[in-house]
């Protein structure tokens, strides 16, 4: 068995040195762009940034976070990563899930490890006449807030079983036109 840091290291060696974990050479290096996950709010929180550092040191080029609904807490976590120089070594993408209902947020808060949903956000969605539409607006606000956090390079947007809403959310969040790279 290998853990996530070991797997990242194996992939980095396949890409950079052109060798498998066994030491056997590849016919050509693997063209990997290596990603990893970060759950900034999983207990014990104080160790999350250290685990992130290990993944980046192992070779992760980009990081996708677990769903983030509390941008103030997320900004604090990213600041800790930035103080360690991690945001200069790997792109941090904030995980943003489009909430469809207050019940969905309550479920995620109670049952998905590392997902923290502020009570005010749940109450706001519960009070809305059209929870789906309010969920779209919340998503736009979360994207805009994430983009203002120093060290965050983008978002990983997830609309579970409602992907058709993504173009309008992306447009409303000001993500268009896409930058030329």
Placement of each model-derived feature along the sequence:
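Short, well-ordered secondary-structure micro-motifs
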Residues: 46-47, 75-76, 103-112, 167-168
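Conserved, mostly hydrophobic/aromatic
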Residues: 55, 59, 94, 155
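Structural motif
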Residues: 58, 149-150
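Catalytic beta/alpha-barrel core
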Residues: 61-70, 154-159
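Glycine- and Gly-Pro-enriched alpha-helical subdomains that act as flexible
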Residues: 76-79, 94
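C-terminal/domain-terminus segments
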Residues: 149, 156-181
């Amino acid at each position: 068995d290998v853990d996530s840091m070991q797997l990242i290291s194996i992939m980095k060696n396949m890409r950079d040195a052109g060798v498998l974990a066994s030491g056997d050479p590849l016919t050509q290096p693997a063209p990997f762009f290596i990603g990893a996950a970060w759950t900034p709010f999983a207990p014990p929180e104080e160790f999350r940034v250290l685990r992130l550092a290990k993944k980046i040191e192992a070779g992760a080029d980009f990081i996708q976070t677990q769903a983030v609904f509390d941008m103030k807490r997320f900004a604090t976590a990213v600041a800790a990563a930035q103080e360690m120089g991690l945001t200069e070594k790997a792109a941090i993408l904030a995980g943003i899930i489009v909430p469809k209902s207050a019940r969905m947020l309550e479920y995620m808060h109670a049952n998905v490890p590392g997902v923290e949903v502020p009570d005010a956000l749940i109450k706001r969605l519960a009070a809305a006449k059209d929870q789906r539409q309010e969920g779209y607006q919340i998503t736009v606000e979360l994207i805009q807030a994430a983009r203002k956090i120093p060290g965050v390079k983008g978002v990983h947007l997830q609309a579970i079983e409602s992907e058709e809403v993504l173009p309008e959310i992306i447009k409303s969040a000001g993500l268009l036109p896409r930058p030329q790279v």
